């Protein structure tokens, strides 16, 4: 009687394991299909040209706005374009962005001061910095957003902290 009970219990456990295994196989197949689809989508994006007026650099496309907005409105505008305010990851990308601002002098980038730390719009901390001389300086205690600028007097290009409410051009990256 005890043997029969153990056998029944083991059989139930085996059936449950078999059912779980079958479910996991289905999930694995769905994940594999999603992976293949996303990989193809990524490859299509890498090989496709940027939209009109956008410029390709590396794996991303960039655009400088023709209108001026405050930092938050600029970010929302980029999001509406399925992009984000630019996140600068390297010196070569910084040099590319510098080239985008030749005629406008200032543009918002995806950098802001959060709880005393400069962070990118995706929440990552800043690792490399390209601040212009004596920046960030938080003049008047309210410069919590980052911009890329070209100094009209010296021609120096780099980052500057600015009031988030200032209206200026912005650079989106997708």
Predicted regions mapped to residue ranges:
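Extracellular, disulfide-bonded carbohydrate-recognition/adhesion ectodomains
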Residues: 1-174
């Amino acid at each position: 009687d005890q043997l029969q009970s153990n056998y029944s219990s083991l059989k139930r456990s085996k059936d449950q394991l078999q059912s779980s295994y079958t479910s996991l196989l289905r999930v694995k197949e769905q994940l594999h299909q999603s992976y293949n689809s996303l990989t193809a989508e990524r490859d299509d994006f890498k090989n496709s040209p940027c939209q009109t007026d956008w410029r390709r650099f590396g794996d991303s496309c960039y655009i400088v706005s023709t209108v001026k907005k405050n930092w938050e409105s600029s970010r929302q505008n980029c999001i509406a374009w399925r992009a984000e305010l630019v996140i600068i990851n390297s010196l070569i990308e910084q040099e590319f962005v510098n080239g985008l601002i030749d005629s406008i002098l200032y543009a918002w980038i995806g950098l802001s001061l959060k709880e005393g730390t400069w962070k990118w719009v995706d929440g990552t901390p800043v690792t490399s910095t390209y601040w212009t001389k004596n920046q960030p300086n938080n003049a008047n205690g309210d410069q919590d957003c980052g911009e890329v600028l070209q100094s009209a007097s010296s021609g120096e290009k780099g980052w500057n902290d600015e009031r988030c409410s200032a209206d200026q051009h912005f650079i989106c990256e997708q």
